[in-house]
């Protein structure tokens, strides 16, 4: 199917070239008719080329008609491609919005709300006990004081010494009073045993209480650390999820661009076959206006469907009518050649007969003009008719016998023209065969600047020279507006 459409595109391009070439020929034909230096060969060749173009356009049009099924299928495919582009556009908008959401910087920072439910009460039950203890002792004798530590060491030594002494003297039979005095010296101080024992109980209670508080704090700290670990793991997970979704959305957008490129290549709107996700400037412009581009192509194909059969009728009419024109002109030319050839030995020629034949041809051309409304064809025939009308007007001014010298030159010119071979470019044969091999040869599309040898632009001149008029001779006219020098060559 794709190859068929490509061939159709080539045929449409060939058709356009042929139309352009035809317009060049029409202008060139008109210039030839108004140039006295133009040869009859070039003029006939131009008429033939115009007919060839009509034939070529008819055959090209017939080939296009044979592609109607492919054209309809192509129109269907183009409509489906429009639907695909519209879907891709919607997907692009969707995924682009998603991508923007994932990249959004508009997310507000959530502040922690102050609430009684968020407060934790820490028990400090040991502090009242500790304060009670501190109130009952002398701070200088506590472990907070360095002096206490020093005294404590001395007292310990004394205590140890006393005990040792007591042990050594334990078997001595000393005076009991001495024992009593010694005992009194060891225990006689300012400290109250009851108070110390009470403080011990107080400190033990304080110790157990603060340990309980520490256990509570350690449990709370452990929970805090667990929460911190969870938060860090969740933060990492959410960041990965964000990166994943951003990458995913970007991949979706890249795939959309690749699909768009494939569609552009399929319908011939992109020559870049590198299927990357990056669109160049031209591709972006085409995609932005893709509906207009495709609808324009669909409309063009619909025109091909609706107009080609009508075009065949018009083109066939052009061929037939232009052939009639060429035949009319050839018949007139041949009649005049035969007439002049038969009367080449006579001393006079009846111009009335020649004028009558030309007028008959003019009338026939008028009938052809009236039978068509094709402006291009009407212009071509009108240009030919104007030359014939001017020829009759000038012949009416020259109703005198021709001398033998001029007559001989006319005859020789006729013989030379009969022996002239006119070559033309090969073109499509005018038949109903629509084989693609019948396309125009590329040589037929010559440059518009120089399709034929350069021509002049002087107005048509059919007149009597001073020399011929003085000798009562007639001025020969060149049918189809060729110059006398070209038509009549003296040996």
UniProtKB/Swiss-Prot annotation:
Membrane topology label: Peripheral membrane protein
Compositionally biased spans, kind Acidic residues: 167-179
GO cellular component: cytoplasm; membrane
Keywords recorded for this protein, A-Z: Autophagy, Coiled coil, Cytoplasm, Membrane, Protein transport, Transport
Superkingdom of the source species: Eukaryota
Low complexity: bias regions: 412-443
Subcellular location: Cytoplasm; Membrane
Signal peptide (residue range): none
Stated name of the protein: Autophagy-related protein 23
